[in-house]
Amino acid sequence: MSDAGHTGVNQLGGVFVNGRPLPDATRQRIVDLAHKGCRPCDISRLLQVSNGCVSKILCRYYESGTIRPRAIGGSKPRVATSDVVEKIEDYKRDQPSIFAWEIRDKLLADNICNNETIPSVSSINRVLRNLAAKKEQVTMQTELYDRIRIVDNFPYNSSWYGQWPIPMNGAVGLNPFVPAPLIEPKTEGEFEKDEDQKPPTEPEDDAAARMRLKRKLQRNRTSFTQVQIESLEKEFERTHYPDVFARERLAQKIQLPEARIQVWFSNRRAKWRREEKMRNKRSSGTMDSSLSNGTPTPTPGSVTGSNMTNPIGSPASTPNRFPSNNSANLPTTNFVPQTSQMYAGLSQPAMDPYSFGIANGFSMAPYPQVTDFQPHHMFQGRSPYDFPYPRMPTNGHGFQQSMSPATTAVGDIPTLSSGMSLPVSAVLNSIDPSLTHSQMHELSDLTQEHYWRPQ
């Protein structure tokens, strides 16, 4: 094995040469170890030969009794020659229920082939399939010709068929139809003969020994007791991959070989993966059905956000800043309108824009309650062309200026049913008393452009 001219090392540490078969000495050792009862996996580890190579050599030895490698390169010689195919057809005609391995034994017994030229069972089955397909094709053609002959001899009354110059029977020249013979039922002895599928006893002792060895190495399925299954399941709950010490301890406890325990854990892990996949599929299906029914699964963020924030336009989130008709004064709130973008150069009052009359000594008459009136509705436009409300009138019915805003009467201010009017000087003094005359003039123009008036 330690050839200096090797071209690689396999997964077991053994060297090999590409294009060269395994040495005959190694092949003989593989067969000897198999006769002693070693498993192919143990032979592979012991001789540092790949498992596939060991299995292939043993399979060829069981079938043909030889350990010599076949020819490398080129195509294999054709073993299903015409003589062999004719002999297979004769066997099948004489005994229609014959098996392929029986045909193979007959070819060897009749000295049609030897161990080197005998076709395999798959080759014989392929020949039988080809013969059956050819026979079916011939049968279909015969049935077609019989139908044509019957139609041609049918007495038609039509003048077109009577004018046909050449009769079909003379043109085709078919033989008269012969019915197929009836199939006689088989006797009891014939049934027993067909059901006997055991191969005949081979004359060679080495062939019989090979078959016995092959049956001995093919073990049956291991059956576990309830105590063994409980111990294995308990260990599987502890870990899916037990180490060698855990396997040895478990083997001594439940009286099973370590190799069987290792195989059981491998199969149990595969079963657990299948069950896990089914559980994930069922959970995803439940989630999809809940989403289709309109009941999404709540998340902590969504619950917290829904409890903390409300939409701006909802009645529950907006306090009622207008009292009922039986109250005479306007209540005060700490609401600050978002007017910093519109009036960036002005200081913002920390008061409600509709409650500054009370801060300056104003009083209003009772007015009807407005339920859907929000301050942000009045600041949606930056220019008078964007603003949805009409511009401020220029007559004296609008804003009435007064030099003494603290003593304004209620009769000077119309109620909200016809519009709200407040003195401009009171508005300016309430915003910032330290403004100059020019700034107050600009603010007065701005107030005329955007006055606060609900319709």
From Swiss-Prot:
Record region (PAI subdomain): 8-64
Impact upon substituting G13Q: In k143; embryonic lethality in a few mutants. Anterior and posterior defects in gonadal distal tip cell (DTC) migration. No defect in head morphogenesis
A Pfam cross-reference name: PAX
Annotated spans, RED subdomain: 83-131
Gene Ontology MF term list: DNA-binding transcription factor activity; DNA-binding transcription factor activity, RNA polymerase II-specific; RNA polymerase II cis-regulatory region sequence-specific DNA binding
Coiled coil spans: none
Name of this protein: Paired box protein 6 homolog
Gene symbol of the encoding locus: vab-3
